[in-house]
């Protein structure tokens, strides 16, 4: 394998990552529900992102018809949950969750996104997540302005200077600082834990400071309204953020995902890809949890979740005869590009680490 050209290596990687949706198929234990266990009586509480609670309610109703003795409800209290789906899990909190090696076919997942505690798997990735600049081409077309692709492009754009790009703290870390730190030698584990050396972090923050000082990128805790109304040249945010506001965009909008804006010409475009990951608490009824997790990762339920949420799955699924949203094509075209280096990351940052990183980022934007 060491003799393969970088291009061939990229193509092989895409077979199991960027084209994950299309390469999978129904496996023996993923196509239908099992009938055994229908007599199991237990309660499960699920905590997940409010955005896809409705989608989970539909899955729960379908599951309940097969297992009427299992009571499953949603909760907003993650400490009360038997099943938690979250995009961040620190090592200390992870101690409260069970081993999941036998609850799903591990080969169906992106290996780097499986959350491990030592040699044991305690988290199964459900949805992919990533951050980068999203651009609506419509305002650029109106102003006859070129759409920027690289770092130098935004400095040379009068449209961007007049309509600064916006970002929140998480977008700035995952879409700007982390990719630059990777270019300087940081590993996926380094940026996932947030435990970056002072030297690496300084290099990652240097270009962000230059961008902040120029005024062409501004920090905002609520940039969505400006993006929808075309009052900003771009939004440095997560895929989930875009999905939430997509239905509010003008019909003539054309959304473009451009993670390379943090990189200069000639530099690698690094794209950290994370996941919303499923964890099962040790206190949960083991049999009930196993039944639900197995059912959740069946092809039929994953397809139902894709349809309802428009979120890209982190597990192989057979999508034949199933139309995919336009936003999917934009996302996967970037993910599959040979110009982009995909770096899979499990976010294990502690609250204190996130707070420290936020303070550093805030200091760059202080007037």
Language model: regions and residue ranges:
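Paired acidic/hydrophobic, glycine-rich loop segments that form the ligand-binding mouth/hinge
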Residues: 82-85, 233-238
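Periplasmic solute-binding protein
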Residues: 111-147, 168-191, 272-280, 356-358
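Conserved N-terminal structural module of periplasmic/extracytoplasmic solute-binding proteins
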Residues: 1-4, 9-14, 19-90, 304, ...
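Hinge/lid segment of periplasmic solute-binding proteins
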Residues: 87-132, 143, 256-261
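Long, aromatic- and glycine/proline-rich binding clefts that accommodate carbohydrate-like moieties
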Residues: 306-365
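Extracytoplasmic/periplasmic substrate-recognition and gating elements
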Residues: 248-313
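A ligand-binding cleft/hinge motif common to bilobed small-molecule-binding domains
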Residues: 89-94, 236-253
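Glycine-centered hinge/linker elements that transmit conformational signals in sensory
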Residues: 191-221, 246
